[in-house]
Amino acid sequence: MRDVEGAIRFLQTAFPEFRARGEGKSQDGSRWVHIGTDETYIALSPAKAEPGKHWMPYRGLPGVNHLAYEVDDVEALCARMKSAGYKDSTPPNAHPHRKRRYFYDLEGNDWEFVEYLSQNPTERNDYKLPDR
């Protein structure tokens, strides 16, 4: 992560309830921030050097393709993200048991947000039905 403040803005746009619940300096003097709620958080710290090649998700290279989070209202989240200028990267999808939206943060990391339309785990986690 090159821009910790940018990541914090992205996460607080997606999750308005997120706050910096702790921060400090690591042994090498670099800043770290825990952003989230009292129950869960994401640990952020800056990269020490610029990578030789900018990583892009879904290209078969080492790295995280995307992180996914369950939300109660994916359309409200989508409106917040677009209003804040984040790029929608949602692939076509029309699953009967979930709504998914994807957004790139300012560093090109892809984040998935899913609203489940069923309480049944088998239906929620079905990957055989085609997304149209």
Give residue spans per PLM region:
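Short, charged/polar surface micro-motifs in flexible loops or helix N-caps
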Residues: 38-42, 48-51, 74
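A short, acidic/glycine-rich surface segment
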Residues: 20, 50-55, 121
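N-terminal beta-strand motif that seeds the catalytic metal site of vicinal oxygen chelate
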Residues: 1-9, 64-69, 117-132
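Core segments of cupin and vicinal oxygen chelate
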Residues: 1-42
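Vicinal oxygen chelate
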Residues: 1-3, 21-23, 33-36, 54-132, ...
